[in-house]
């Protein structure tokens, strides 16, 4: 593991729920701008999505709501008051002084853990238009220089180095490194292509929007 500056979150790290919320907001801002910012219900569905999430979670509205209040206090999310429902948006760019490519990369690292440059290039196609892996490497190095990401050197049996975010706890980092050692290529059963994942994610988003609309209609009866 390459030595990087201490993370500014070392004394108050993000929880796994915090990271999932922020990653989901980053993703939906890019992929479904027509429904962003997200209501609490839509955000819960995004967090619990079955695709493009490692690991898959089953969070409750109470868990997400509690985490949102904590993130709001840290200046990482913002509540947008609405006539029908309150909505939430992330403020990572402003809160951490990041440019759009860096926000996109952090979002992916929040959602799927340590990833290779090629994985990030493939998975980022709906979040930001990166030219190549070298452009991704450049922004990751900028993040690492501020203690927000870390370069994990490949181990025996692995073909590529990986990167992960450093906004979580030391225990999260150690667990990720240990997982890399026990499962070098992180083999996944029946891995989906990026296009297939995108189509499934879009369907899940449409379903979430329909469920939210139905809830509003029932509430107006």
UniProtKB/Swiss-Prot annotation:
SUPFAM superfamilies attached to this UniProt entry: Winged helix' DNA-binding domain
Instruction: Give the top-rank taxon of the lineage listed in the UniProt record for this protein.
Output: Bacteria
Q: Where is the signal peptide?
A: none
User: Sorted alphabetically, which Pfam families does this protein's record hold?
Assistant: DUF480
The family assignment reads: Belongs to the UPF0502 family.
| PANTHER family per record | UPF0502 PROTEIN YCEH
Q: What is this protein called?
A: UPF0502 protein PSPA7_1674
Write the lineage as a comma-separated list.
Bacteria, Pseudomonadati, Pseudomonadota, Gammaproteobacteria, Pseudomonadales
């Amino acid at each position: 593991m390459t030595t990087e500056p201490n993370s500014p979150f070392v004394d108050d790290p993000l929880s796994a729920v915090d990271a999932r919320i922020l990653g989901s907001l980053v993703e939906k801002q890019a992929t479904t701008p027509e429904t962003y910012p997200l209501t609490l219900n839509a955000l819960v569905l995004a967090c619990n999505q079955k695709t493009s999430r490692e690991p898959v979670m089953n969070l409750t509205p109470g868990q997400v709501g509690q985490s949102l209040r904590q993130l709001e206090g840290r200046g990482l999310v913002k509540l947008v008051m609405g006539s029908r429902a309150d909505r939430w948006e992330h403020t990572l760019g402003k809160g951490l002084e990041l440019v759009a490519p860096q926000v996109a990369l952090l979002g992916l690292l929040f959602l799927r853990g340590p990833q290779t440059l090629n994985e990030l290039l493939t998975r980022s196609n709906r979040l930001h238009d990166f030219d190549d892996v070298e452009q991704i490497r450049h922004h990751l190095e900028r993040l690492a220089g501020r203690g927000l990401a870390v370069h994990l050197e490949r181990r025996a049996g692995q073909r590529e180095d990986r990167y992960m975010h450093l906004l979580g706890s030391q225990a999260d980092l150690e667990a990720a490194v240990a997982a890399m050692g026990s499962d070098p290529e992180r083999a996944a059963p029946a891995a989906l292509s990026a296009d297939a994942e995108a189509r499934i994610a879009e369907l899940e988003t449409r379903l979430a929007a329909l469920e939210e609309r139905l809830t509003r209609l029932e509430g107006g009866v």
